[in-house]
Amino acid sequence: FLKRDGFSKIPPLNGDEDFGLVAGKDVTQLISLQVYSCVECGRCTEHCPASTTGKVLNPKEIILGMQSYLNESGPASDAPLLTEALVESRDNPPAKYMSMEAAFECTTCGSCEYQCPVGIQHLPIIIGLRRGATNTGAWEDNHGTKLFLALEKHGNALGLSATERDKFIQKQGFPIFDGTQEYCLWLGCMGGYDPKGREIIADFARVMQHLGTTFGVLRKEKCTGDPARRLGNDLVFQTMAEFGLKALEAAKVQKIVSICPHCVRTISNDWREYGIAPEIEHHSEFMARHKDRLPRQNSGESIVYHDPCYLGRYRNVYEEPREIVAMAGELVEAPRSHERSFCCGAGGGLAFLGEETGERVSHVRAAELVGTGAQIVGTACPFCNTMFRDALSSIGDAPPQLLDIAQLTARALPKMQETGEQ
């Protein structure tokens, strides 16, 4: 009964006076009930990608730190919940675990919540702490500042001019959505600006064309605001969400398909605070539904599939991408898969912050995937693809090939004339 409806549901923004979890007075009764329900088993920490790779973050100690704060300062206190002294707190466990350094090491993978036997929702608490630090200006990070400025100025997390997206659309020959097509193909930051993400979009577009599914793209599209939302910047997130909803409404979009689980999650859940977003699905769901009309490659190659956190634990989509992988080759399971999958390290905005402490999460996961002996690593998220691109290149002389499920499917399609550079 402790849980809100849905997995890791962040409470909606509550007016201009809601800055997040800044002090004791911001701690709700539900949060208090949850933190005092902790049985201190440590399963959340045991499965946390940040904690297990040598970071400061310890989900159990975040919960116990909230307990200690409420016991010592009280729920009406104005004292800050998070300590600002990052270096000074390292030798002081209570301060260390409740530091901004710890709060901003979370990848929001949700493994802690999945593992918790009493239903504590760690992520709304951690993101609430981030909101309190970011919205009040207490959190100062060069990477974070650069990200927020990129979103505000350019409308995408990569900080590139919107004309770059326009050029890509023209070279691919993508039609602009005008209300007559069945789907709006959502490019996202990675699909619209990242070279590898563009390859995935191009191949998925080929799949849709092969199926005879009509689609178009928005003339103007900005980031969903996912990294801003997870890092606690309410203003930037709200700006992105309102722009996106107005663009979809103006284009009379009814159905969206996206290659990015983060875009799917944000549009289907977080945007609903500001209006009713159209129906959206992930491209794995789309392809699985049409699998009987897609060619089988039967390459015989072994493919280990990595479950993205925002597709698996957040959306409960596990079998659909596996059905697509099995059509392309021999499916191999990683030691940690499905609900117990290990994060790539990109979520929660961390793809843009860098990783300076401990082992790189992506390298730990990549080594695990390589250890299966599979010839191909299959992904279903452009952020996972980006993280593994770097990680796999650092492992041995002949790393396995890295392909999105759309690319696996497109390999079996009839060859088409190239539409231009990506």
Language-model features: where?
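Active/binding-pocket-proximal capping segment
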Residues: G54-E72, A79-L82, R322-A328, S337-R340
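Catalytic cores of enzyme domains
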Residues: F1, E281, E285-F286, G300-Y314
